[in-house]
């Protein structure tokens, strides 16, 4: 006797979120030499291209630049005067902002028997931020799909955040994979 075919985790409601996006969000401050230097120290990469204007001027960049992940970090700072999310989010908040960096709800309506977790990020750096840049981001759900893992069925979603400077040039693209695991 054949077992009945399980319903797909990719329902019409789940499929409908593909292409949905946030409003653009712009950094509250211009990128500064001090912020770049502090970030490079925090990630323990003190290359002179991140803080020495004379050395950096002689490189292919023509001046000081920020390490690749700086852009992703910089836009995520909350504006002055806003509430700390640790005080406003639910107790089980994992620090991941399902609203996307640009704000506005970007959640996937998985079936109720699903529990979600962070499946990883891929950061594609196309250009490095420079002092004076104003960074803007916009997030969009680009893909949802299903696969079977050792523990059962999984639903996966990909949120793509594009970071640009004030000239509209793409600095980097972050691809976040969210995983929804079926609970039995």
Identify the residue ranges that each predicted region occupies.
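HotDog/MaoC-like acyl-thioester-processing domains
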Residues: 2-24, 117-184
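Hot-dog-fold acyl-thioester-processing enzymes
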Residues: 2-120
């Amino acid at each position: 006797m054949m077992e009945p075919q399980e319903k797909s985790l990719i329902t019409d409601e789940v499929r409908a979120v593909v292409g949905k996006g946030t409003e653009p969000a712009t950094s509250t401050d211009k990128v500064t030499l001090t912020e770049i230097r502090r970030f490079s120290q925090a990630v323990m990469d003190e290359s002179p291209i991140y803080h020495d204007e004379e050395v950096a001027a002689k490189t292919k960049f023509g001046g000081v630049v920020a390490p690749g992940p700086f852009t992703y970090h910089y836009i995520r700072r909350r504006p002055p005067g806003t509430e700390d999310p640790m005080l406003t989010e639910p107790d089980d908040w994992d620090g991941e902002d399902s609203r996307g960096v640009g704000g506005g709800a970007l959640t996937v309506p998985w079936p109720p028997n699903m529990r979600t977790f962070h499946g990883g990020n891929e950061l594609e750096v196309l250009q490095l931020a420079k002092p004076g840049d104003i960074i803007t981001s916009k997030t969009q759900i680009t893909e949802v799909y299903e696969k079977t893992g050792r523990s059962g069925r999984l639903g996966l979603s990909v949120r793509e955040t594009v970071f640009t400077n004030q000239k509209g040039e793409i600095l980097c693209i972050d691809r976040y994979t969210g995983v929804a695991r079926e609970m039995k």
